[in-house]
């Protein structure tokens, strides 16, 4: 055993590799540990950084307690016993986003930060598109796509970061020009002791921002103390707020565009659009530019994505709805639809309370459930249909639906009980829809 490694990277994968790449670029050779016996990225580490040692299958406290700094991947909880032991000894434990923040500390604020239980990726992508349309050099990543440290290679004037609660736990000095917490609904209760702990992790972002944008329709996003703040919401705006009045988007008294010209479907996505507009306004983007992007941006895969129309029935893939709040938002967003809604839900509930689904399920004509916790969701609606596969779910939905109806896959659960990830689940749904008869 080497007597000491000053820097230890806990957790490999894309984030861990980005940390190794960054540290080696600084002339620091870290030690990497991962609890998995065959962590993703191990082959890349061995070929690209042969000088970096990997300990797989667990965390070795003998190394941890001698480190100067531990960089922890967001998937590893801070209360992991080995991490707790290092913290108790006063060893600094931070995440990759904190390393990123320290690297750009001498620059004027150049980060737009986006967190929330749902809608983060849509808003992050929208903000990036609006900045590009405005001619601003932008780099987009964080919790999606490219890890924050890898964005440093890009010649960007603005960094747009999607940030999870896990990442924010270990981030302290991210100097954002603007940030938002889009919403706070129950999620990751297998990691947090209660909703308050989860909310506090999210709202850590506010204290690292020059300007904050909160959701006035969600009280849990409101700052706990006065800040330089503004809000967005679906109701008519007051003062300088962002909102909707007479089916038009407004900033204060300034009309931006009719909501009928927006390509995104669902009121929850209209709220996402308002948040994106408020964020880019903070860095000087023209409102006409915002409107241009809103007219052409149709959304992301697996997020209320229309994957087919068969026999007049619209099939919508919302596989990214991995928690209850996301499915509630999807159902609320489609509540103005005139036809019936047939919902396919279920999967790994991650210890969630499903009771908030009970009222939104009254808007659903038929409920089809599958997966580990499908029975818990089925118990919320009389006449729910239980199946054991996506093929069976789509076939049953197609049998029940008539022209003008929507079949919505919005699971309210994670996918890992049946699939490798939510994308694979959504792809299966799409594949089953494509195999249906009818145009």
From Swiss-Prot:
Pathway(s) where this gene product acts: Cell wall biogenesis; peptidoglycan biosynthesis
Top-level division of the source organism's lineage: Bacteria
Enzyme Commission number: 6.3.2.9
Annotated positions binding ATP: 116-122
Gene Ontology MF terms: ATP binding; UDP-N-acetylmuramoylalanine-D-glutamate ligase activity
A GO cellular component annotation in the UniProt record: cytoplasm
Top EC class, one word: ligase
Membrane-spanning ranges: none
UniProt main location, coarse: cytoplasm
Matches recorded under InterPro entries: Mur-like_cat_sf, Mur_ligase_C, Mur_ligase_C_dom_sf, Mur_ligase_cen, MurD
GO biological process terms held by the UniProt record: cell division; cell wall organization; peptidoglycan biosynthetic process; regulation of cell shape
Compartments where found: Cytoplasm
Pfam families: Mur_ligase_C, Mur_ligase_M, MurD-like_N
Reactions the enzyme catalyzes: UDP-N-acetyl-alpha-D-muramoyl-L-alanine + D-glutamate + ATP = UDP-N-acetyl-alpha-D-muramoyl-L-alanyl-D-glutamate + ADP + phosphate + H(+)
Keywords carried by this UniProt record: ATP-binding, Cell cycle, Cell division, Cell shape, Cell wall biogenesis/degradation, Cytoplasm, Ligase, Nucleotide-binding, Peptidoglycan synthesis
Record-linked HAMAP family: MurD
Record function comment: Cell wall formation. Catalyzes the addition of glutamate to the nucleotide precursor UDP-N-acetylmuramoyl-L-alanine (UMA).
Family: Belongs to the MurCDEF family.
Name used for this protein in its record: UDP-N-acetylmuramoylalanine--D-glutamate ligase
